[in-house]
């Protein structure tokens, strides 16, 4: 997949089949759009183009909001889009000035004139232009005028739950990791660097890798204990992670840590990715470290049993 950072980098491609969006979750609904684009591109001997924005429009339009968190980092989003077989990714810098672009200008001057759109595929809730003023009806009118095709993908649902990034974010905030993973179509993950902790886990036989995130806008799933898969370089492991404040040792800062099963390597300053599979329990304050140790033994048994049943 070729990535273009700005319209000035983009070179027109043959019969471009295009979609536009922020694609925070890159979820199953988005995958349906990408699949349709690929099929259309094959039928017209064209190429697929995803148009997205950086930074996320909400960060520009609502710069003072303290609760803006996103499911995927920019790097993870791009990687997922590539995995779905897209040919070209055009990243348009989203500025205050660009946020004032009206719907007609966006379609005619950008999608039509600069990209040379042949066909456009959008989701059921797609709006475009300043203040999301452009509706699908307006899009169809512009498509007729400029002579390109437009298609809207209906809402996708699983178990009668309509798939949307908002629903996924809410599921993560509530700790409903299985629901979030189902709607995403893959396991929610956190990537970060391993930093030094207070080594209390090591003292009680459960050494942990403490993770420091490199993206302040990354959405962290709810506090609790989780069954996890861990990727370090090209190696994969099973383990159990904790997100919380470690109340048993009176820690006041939110920490992300993972105990990796059958693992005894020094990985300080290394980058690892934690994939969250299931939420095991709430974080609890125990009377002492011995009580915590006994509970961790039970947690490990629960997690291993869960993985063995997969």
Question: Where would I find each of the regions flagged by the language model?
Answer:
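A short acidic, often aromatic-flanked loop/helix-cap motif at beta-alpha or helix-coil junctions
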Residues: 9-12, 96-99, 157-162
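N-terminal Rossmann-like or analogous alpha/beta NTP/dinucleotide-binding catalytic cores
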Residues: 59-124, 128-146
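N-terminal catalytic cores of NTP/NDP-binding nucleotidyl/phosphoryl-transfer enzymes
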Residues: 7-69, 73
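Glycine-rich, Lys/Arg-enriched anion-binding loops that position phosphate/diphosphate groups
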Residues: 143-240
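Short acidic-hydrophobic, aromatic-tinged amphipathic segments that line or gate anion-handling sites
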Residues: 2-8, 90
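Residue-level signal for inorganic ion chemistry
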Residues: 27, 81, 120, 180, ...
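Phosphate/ribose-recognition catalytic cores of enzymes acting on nucleotide-derived substrates
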Residues: 197-310
């Amino acid at each position: 997949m070729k990535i273009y950072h700005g319209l000035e980098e983009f070179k027109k491609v043959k019969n471009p089949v295009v979609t536009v969006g922020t694609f925070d979750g890159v979820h199953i609904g988005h995958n349906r759009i990408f699949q349709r684009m690929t099929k259309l591109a094959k039928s017209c001997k064209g190429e697929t183009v995803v148009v997205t924005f950086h930074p996320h429009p909400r960060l520009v339009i609502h710069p003072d909001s303290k609760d803006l968190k996103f499911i995927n980092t920019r790097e993870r989003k791009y990687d997922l889009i590539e995995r779905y077989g897209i040919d070209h990714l055009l990243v348009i810098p989203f500025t205050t000035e660009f946020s004032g672009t009206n719907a007609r200008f966006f379609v005619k001057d950008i999608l039509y004139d600069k990209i040379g759109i042949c066909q456009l595929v959008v989701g059921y809730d797609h709006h475009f232009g300043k203040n999301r003023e452009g509706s699908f009806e307006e899009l169809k009118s512009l498509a007729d005028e400029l002579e390109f095709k437009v298609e809207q993908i209906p809402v996708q649902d699983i178990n009668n739950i309509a798939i949307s990034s908002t629903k996924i974010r809410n599921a993560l905030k509530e700790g409903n990791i299985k629901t979030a993973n189902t709607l995403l179509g893959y396991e929610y993950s956190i990537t970060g660097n391993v930093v030094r902790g207070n080594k209390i886990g090591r003292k009680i036989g459960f050494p942990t890798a403490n993770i420091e995130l490199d993206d302040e806008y990354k959405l962290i799933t709810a506090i609790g204990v989780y069954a996890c898969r861990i990727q370090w370089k090209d190696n994969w492991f099973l383990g159990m992670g904790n997100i919380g404040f470690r109340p048993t040792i009176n820690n006041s800062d939110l920490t992300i840590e993972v105990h990796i099963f059958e693992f005894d390597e020094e990985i300080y300053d290394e980058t690892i990715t934690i994939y969250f599979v299931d939420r095991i329990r709430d974080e609890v304050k125990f009377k002492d470290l011995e009580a915590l140790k006994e509970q961790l033994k039970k947690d490990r048994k629960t997690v291993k049993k869960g993985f063995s049943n997969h």
